[in-house]
């Protein structure tokens, strides 16, 4: 996970992916053990549904299928999962890796994350992505087109809700305000790490993110990608 994008250093942090672990006792033990041995954060994944038949190509596997064809797996809601782990831990950071932001209302998502950050003592990191599974968007009832632009507006809208005493946002796709949204995050913001494998993702990270999460590739690939984040 790369942060400090406007500087000259890359920071790779010790993090643990929770995977499809929905056994309450095992999930608690995993998070507590990670905290005890010094992991900085645990990361959840996000898919609301996996359509049984889909033509979209999964970009992170040679099979082009999620889970190499084993799509029928537990993928818990990441924010509820993080809330559960927050209650079982005291200092480890809790992150989404990643949250498919354009599938969700930015106002509701900002409220959920603001509440979770406030009640966990400021331990939330928001990894975000634009999504790749068009059929999932169709099932949810959200347009797949313009998801990049929608993601950009969602991030700006959520930042306003977290920071401003009275927030409003007026974009092409997102429009609201003036509104109160309490509680706000402890630090009036939540770190946003942009995930993805494309040049567009790297540019988005440099333009509106606080970090970059290259979703695939070697360390050498990451070193090649990072300069792109600094072009904006």
Locate predicted features.
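N-terminal beta1-alpha1-beta2 module of alpha/beta enzyme domains
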Residues: 8-88, 190
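Ser/Thr-centric signal marking residues that sit
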Residues: 44, 89, 96, 115, ...
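Internal, glycine-rich beta/alpha segment that forms the wall or movable "lid"
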Residues: 52-54, 64-67, 81-83, 92, ...
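Receiver (REC) domain switch/active-site residues of two-component response regulators
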Residues: 40, 210-211
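Glycine-rich phosphate-binding active-site loops on the catalytic face of alpha/beta enzymes
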Residues: 215-218
């Amino acid at each position: 996970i790369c942060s400090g994008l406007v500087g000259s250093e890359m920071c790779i942090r010790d993090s643990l992916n929770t995977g499809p672990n929905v056994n309450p006792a095992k999930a608690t033990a995993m998070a507590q053990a990670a905290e005890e041995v010094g992991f900085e954060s645990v990361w959840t994944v996000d898919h609301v549904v996996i359509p049984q038949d889909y033509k979209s190509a999964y970009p992170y596997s040679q099979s082009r299928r999620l889970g190499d064809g084993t799509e029928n797996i537990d993928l818990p809601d990441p924010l509820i999962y993080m809330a559960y782990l927050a209650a079982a831990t005291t200092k480890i950071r809790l992150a989404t890796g990643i949250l498919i932001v354009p599938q969700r209302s930015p106002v509701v998502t900002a409220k959920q994350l603001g509440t979770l950050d406030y009640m966990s003592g400021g331990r939330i990191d928001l990894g975000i992505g634009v999504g790749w599974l068009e059929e999932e968007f169709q099932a949810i009832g959200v347009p797949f087109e313009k998801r990049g632009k929608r993601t950009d507006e969602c991030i700006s809208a959520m930042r306003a809700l977290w920071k401003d005493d009275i927030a409003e946002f007026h974009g092409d796709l997102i429009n609201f305000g003036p509104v109160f949204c309490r509680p706000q995050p402890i630090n009036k913001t939540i770190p946003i790490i942009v995930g993805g494998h494309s040049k567009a993702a790297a540019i988005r990270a440099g333009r509106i993110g606080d970090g970059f999460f290259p979703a695939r590739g070697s360390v050498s690939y990451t070193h090649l990608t990072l300069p792109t984040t600094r072009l904006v």
